[in-house]
From Swiss-Prot:
One of its GO terms (molecular function) is phosphoglucomutase activity. This is Phosphoglucomutase. It comes from Entamoeba histolytica (strain ATCC 30459 / HM-1:IMSS / ABRM). It is found in: Cytoplasm. One of its GO terms (biological process) is carbohydrate metabolic process.
């Protein structure tokens, strides 16, 4: 195959900004704006420190609409910049955690991940996303993404290779390309290969398979018709021995079958209604988001919140082979995540965004980390990992059942944890697609009033109100304006944040976190006073016109 380098002038395209984890835009905007992807990909190569000299790069994605077009452009821009060692997942597939593992195992300089994560997909109403990962396997830090944004704002020229025939990436193998005298190879790989090898280092699959067989474990796994479908069959059916009937929505589709791939109680209702009832035939259920880095865990009679999952994993790490082999060095959580894990062990508190865990993991300070937004992961890779979290829970069930010599369920483990450590009642309100200026004005009003605001929580006085600022203990960097916190004398917290993962308008997230030793109370009643206070101090209805949230988690 032959390639010729072309250069042509361009102009900046407004709105090419990076949120919590990369670019997120409506697919229709990306598709209908001339040079949208060519501009942005060139900006990435112009600005990112790990793309300034040719090295090995990995490209993959969650299978959503426009991914194949983006993949083609990334390859051709890479060729034009002298990159000769390009690795892509077959048919463009590679989950985010799998790509992190592949970057690490193949010692790549960078990874391009085509995903809008838990956002819907499709031509008309779906989103497209693209993010850059570094050589450690983790998301690009703020100093890199800021330079990419600056490059996109000032771009004047597109540099790209033109191929003499289309690339075929639907078969594993090497594609040799000669680009103006330089030979390059596009390696099309099995997107499962490196990730499954990594999972074998983390878990004892023979033991888990015996456990599944011994107790006839009934499991349901929802892949939302996204990329984890290709991984779920291998992991849950081949390695654990579960029947294929355990898998739901397991065939990846460009529009995810019209599903919203956010693994929470609202969008994973099919799984929730099948597994949570007390008379359910299922022992445990899992759902994973579009790119496979988020997880929902439910059991018969039980929903395991991400915050509780992190806390329980922190107490049961000896049941997880990865930690037995590598040691357990510490835990980090994002600031809005409930303080459940704080009652178990000392923690490091970071802003929202998996990239903030990277320095802590690279420096050996932590082994486990998690976010309230259904993300859990370990230092084995540098992304959160839905399937890894699910296998941790299967490992815990296996260990507890072995000790009890009977099948121990999710609900029993959850309630046993609460009985020992107490319970953090927790809820999140999402106000989606609100006017961006109104949302920003609301946040600024609370910042301005932080030192003078007066409120109490059913008689419990406010301890302080601030705008969370993170000081990285590894590199000394400071990240400000990460969420308005109302912290009360009993430790209860109300938190306001603007999300960085939406594609239209702004999303306001409001978090409620209250600790109690009584773990059997009604959550809605426990948090009712907090909701009233939140509406009052934020004036959210006045600013947004919304009386109710779009989603409650």
């Amino acid at each position: 195959m032959q390639a010729t380098i072309k250069r042509y002038p361009t102009s900046p395209i407004s709105g090419q900004t990076l949120g919590t984890s990369g670019l997120r835009k409506r697919a229709s905007e990306v598709e209908n704006t001339p040079n949208y992807l060519e501009n942005f990909v060139n900006a990435m190569f112009n600005a990112a420190s790990n793309l300034q000299k040719p090295g090995k790069i990995i490209i993959g994605g969650d299978g959503r609409y426009l991914n194949l077009k983006a993949l083609d452009i990334i390859i051709r821009v890479a060729l034009s910049r002298g990159f000769t060692d390009i690795v892509v997942g077959k048919s463009g597939f590679m989950s985010t955690p799998a790509e992190s593992a592949t970057i690490i195992r193949r010692k790549a300089e960078a990874g391009f991940i085509m995903t809008a994560s838990h956002n819907p997909a499709g031509k008309e109403h779906g989103d497209f996303g693209l993010k850059l990962n570094m050589s450690n396997g983790g998301p690009a830090p703020i100093e890199v993404t800021s330079k990419i944004e600056e490059s996109a704002r000032n771009i004047k020229e597109i540099v790209i290779a033109e191929l003499n025939k289309p690339l075929n990436i639907d078969s594993v193998g090497d594609i040799e390309i000669e680009c103006e005298g330089k030979k390059a190879v596009v390696h099309v790989i099995d997107p499962l290969e490196d990730y499954i090898a990594y999972l074998h280092e983390c878990f004892d699959f023979e033991n888990l398979k015996q456990f599944v067989s011994k107790y006839h474990l009934k499991v349901q796994v929802d892949g939302f018709n996204a990329v984890t479908g290709i991984y779920n069959k291998k992991v849950f059916c081949e390695l654990l021995g579960l029947p294929e009937s355990s898998l739901k929505n397991a065939i990846p589709m460009p529009d995810f079958g019209g599903k919203h791939p956010d693994p929470n109680l609202t969008y994973a209702a099919e799984l929730v209604h099948a597994v949570i009832p007390e008379d359910s035939p299922y022992d445990i259920g899992f759902a994973f988001d579009g790119d496979g880095d988020r997880n929902l865990i439910v059991g018969r009679g039980a929903f395991v919140s991400p915050s509780d999952s992190l806390a329980i994993l922190s107490t049961k790490y000896n049941d997880i082979p990865f930690f037995v082999k590598n040691g357990f060095k510490g835990v980090a959580r994002s600031m809005p995540t409930s303080a459940a894990v704080d009652h178990v062990t000392s923690i490091t508190e970071t802003p929202t965004g998996w990239k903030f865990f990277g320095n802590l993991m690279d420096s050996g300070k932590i082994s486990l980390c998690g976010e309230e937004s259904f993300g859990t992961g370990c230092c084995g890779i540098r992304e959160k990992d839905g399937i890894w979290a699910a296998l941790c829970w299967v490992s815990i069930l296996a260990a507890e059942s072995e000790r009890a010599q009977r099948l121990v369920g999710v609900k029993e483990i959850l309630e046993s944890h609460w009985a020992k450590y107490g319970r953090n009642y927790y809820q999140r309100y999402d106000f989606d697609e609100v006017d961006k200026k109104a949302a920003e004005d609301m946040m600024q009003m609370m910042r301005d009033n932080a030192k003078t605001v007066k409120c109490d929580l059913n008689g419990v006085p406010l301890k302080f109100c601030d705008d969370f600022e993170y000081h990285d203990s590894v590199d000394g960097s400071v990240t400000s304006k990460q969420g308005i916190r109302f912290v009360f004398e009993d430790g209860s917290r109300i938190i306001f944040r603007l999300s960085g993962t939406g594609s239209v308008g702004a999303t306001i997230r409001v978090y409620f976190d209250k600790y109690s030793k009584d773990y059997k109370a009604d959550q809605t009643k426990v948090l009712a006073d907090m909701v009233t206070v939140a509406y009052a101090v934020s004036q959210i209805t006045k600013f947004t016109g919304r009386e109710k949230p779009s989603v409650v988690t």
